Amino acid sequence: MRKTENTNDKSTALDEMNALDIVTLMNEEDHTVPRAITPCLPLIAEAAETIVSRFEQGGRVFTAGAGTSGRIAVLDAAELPPTFSIDESRWTGLIAGGYDAMWMPLEENEDDREKIVADLKAQSFSKDDVLIGVTASGSTPYVLGALSYAKQIGAASVSISCNADTEAGKLSDIAIEVQTGPEIIRGSTRLKAGTAQKMILNMLSTAAMVRLGRVYQNEMVNMRLLNQKLAGRAVTILMNTTGLSEDEALQALKESGNDIKAAIFMTLTNGTLEVARRCLSHENGHLKKAIQYHRKGF
């Protein structure tokens, strides 16, 4: 039996516990998740570098999952365009049952290996892309169908599961298998397994975006200024990275057309917007490299 389906001996009297005891046990169990992920960090880093390599060549990322795994995959993908200004088509989350499954249980769809292939074909999924299959059990047919198709066409593939020696892992170029162990409610992998999957997807997408130059120092310099909170954050980013006052930062953003990277570049180099764009383009959007390129007398 898969360990995610085993009985957790610490919770066999769960139905007799008061609320404080339940949440205390849950918190203790959740603390085991980061430790379980630690041995997988080299594989997670390898997967992130694979994503970077494909992305730089124009490839895309597709994450596929069913139930909780699919919802987490879609959630992570949805955060990337506003945070890092990537086109929505570059990182797509696919869930068994389609987007209706985000809001209602459509678990019967997870047994369909063919639907995901049709979905990927509809997206023109190719050998240049990356498929990330997310399945706590490591045996979800929907995800296995996606990984099999990726293997068939020569696309890069990564699996994230919470058991050892999984079918998903055997179909993947990189198999990330986190041993999260039994849940406090037997088989309810929305708990520790879901937490582990979210943490790993956070790592993959964040590490890839940082490596792709979407972050300067530790600031979100590629974010879209879609509301007042983000506009205010952009001002703070300018102040933190350049030493400008608030009024000066507002003016710098205005002169750059609300392009945070360009505003920082212009401030630190005394360059024009045209020069900023040229240097950033030369360095594929890496702000620090663009500044260094300018200082070398581009």
Swiss-Prot record:
GO terms for molecular function: carbohydrate derivative binding; carbon-oxygen lyase activity; ether hydrolase activity. It is an enzyme of class 4 (lyase). It catalyses: N-acetyl-D-muramate 6-phosphate + H2O = N-acetyl-D-glucosamine 6-phosphate + (R)-lactate. Gene3D superfamilies: 1.10.8.1080, Glucose-6-phosphate isomerase like protein, domain 1. The active site is at residues 79, 110. Pfam families: GKRP_SIS_N (PF22645). Pathway: Amino-sugar metabolism; N-acetylmuramate degradation. Keywords: Carbohydrate metabolism, Lyase. InterPro entries: Etherase_MurQ, MURQ/GCKR, SIS_dom, SIS_dom_sf. One of its GO terms (biological process) is amino sugar catabolic process. Residues 51-214 form the SIS domain. SUPFAM superfamilies: SIS domain (SSF53697). Its EC number is 4.2.1.126. Homodimer. Specifically catalyzes the cleavage of the D-lactyl ether substituent of MurNAc 6-phosphate, producing GlcNAc 6-phosphate and D-lactate. A lyase-type mechanism (elimination/hydration) is suggested for the cleavage of the lactyl ether bond of MurNAc 6-phosphate, with the formation of an alpha,beta-unsaturated aldehyde intermediate with (E)-stereochemistry, followed by the syn addition of water to give product. Belongs to the GCKR-like family. MurNAc-6-P etherase subfamily. This is N-acetylmuramic acid 6-phosphate etherase 2.
